Amino acid sequence: MQLNSNGWHVDDHIVVAVSTGIDSMCLLYQLLNDYKDSYRKLTCLHVNHGVRSASIEEARFLEAYCERHHIDLHIKKLDLSHSLNRNNSIQNEARIKRYEWFDEMMNVLEADVLLTAHHLDDQLETIMYRIFNGKSTRNKLGFDELSKRNGYQIYRPLLAVSKKEIKQFQERYHIPYFEDESNKDNKYVRNDIRNRIIPAIDENNQLKVSHLLKLKQWHDEQYDILQYSAKQFIQEFVKFDEQSKYLEVSRQAFNNLPNSLKMVVLDCLLSKYYELFNISAKTYEEWFKQFSSKKAQFSINLTDKWIIQIAYGKLIIMAKNNGDTYFRVQTIEKPGNYIFNKYRLEIHSNLPKCLFPLTVRTRQSGDTFKLNGRDGYKKVNRLFIDCKVQQWVRDQMPIVLDKQQRIIAVGDLYQQQTIKQWIIISKNGDE
């Protein structure tokens, strides 16, 4: 049984994830024998999921095996009681916790490469699983031989080796291992694919499961192209303000993308800049219909912390302002520099004293101001519409009133002509 050893070098510290199953024990055996000169140091990691009674026996066996072969071994016992008590599927949670521990240990050990015993049959099973559960469009179809994770590399040296070859190798060298009885239970989807569906396909002489590997190659090439296109789009069209937790993209440019690329763009933005959202394709498609509608302004709640705001020609992803405190009313008795919400107000000393005290507040229904250079008044709300001001900006913008409660300034959009040079309003942080 030949390993693909291109994923590590002779001066590397390699770490092997060993479950005591036939695959990982055969991998470990090869590393201790035919490939013993291919690395500098070898360490084993074992996870006791604490679900099966045989787990304790497996851990003891591996301790004795590693001691006999002078291998450093680290064991982690997971607590999955929360999922068991709630009747949740433990497979996904176990995988997440397992790799969190791998992350921790690879850092502690200062190791270079983590080896796993995924083989060819695992690859075919994973491809089929992702196709039929609808997760093929936004992920690679199966495993990569080499992948990067949190400062280290994961390598799968058995990915071209079939389960049949592994079994023949085990029988030839009498390699000890444990059989996980739960692998025979077809109530688990992956087991059903492995034990029932794939063998049924292989029985048909006109069908070959191995053709899935060609599909994976083609699919993954298209996936990489989409990822590249998404990064190019983000670089060209997305403006990101990390301090304000705010990003902005042209609504038209986004709407012009094909739906497949829209999904990848949003996946990149939501996972890279914020929390790891898990948005379904169906939800995305509903959003895309709203984005392309003629409605000028609306919002979509992502979570209790994040929101998508559509404002005229802009698509904005931002943190909700629920936790922030904003001024609603402020009184100014004398000239000076003041902050109102996210605006800076400079009140000059030349402003006539008869206008004081000034009232600074946010908008109210029915607000109007006198037009400059002609008769008549205009509604503040109409000014906002004409200037395409987003709803959340309208809610914070300062409106300045004189002593007689006449509006003399509306943010950075309007100042009464007679006092324009004496009241300067700008967004806080603008030069």
Curated annotation (Swiss-Prot):
Of the GO CC terms on this record, one is: cytoplasm
Q: Provide the protein's localization.
A: Cytoplasm
Quote the record's binding site residues for ATP.
Answer: S19, T20, G21, I22, D23, S24
Question: Which Pfam families is this protein grouped with?
Answer: ATP_bind_3, TilS_C
Keyword tags? ATP-binding, Cytoplasm, Ligase, Nucleotide-binding, tRNA processing
Report the Gene3D superfamilies cross-referenced here: HUPs (3.40.50.620)
Domain text: The N-terminal region contains the highly conserved SGGXDS motif, predicted to be a P-loop motif involved in ATP binding.
Q: Give the HAMAP family listed for this entry.
A: tRNA_Ile_lys_synt
What does the UniProt function comment say about this protein?
Ligates lysine onto the cytidine present at position 34 of the AUA codon-specific tRNA(Ile) that contains the anticodon CAU, in an ATP-dependent manner. Cytidine is converted to lysidine, thus changing the amino acid specificity of the tRNA from methionine to isoleucine.
Name-wise, this protein is: tRNA(Ile)-lysidine synthase
Please give the organism: Staphylococcus aureus (strain MRSA252)
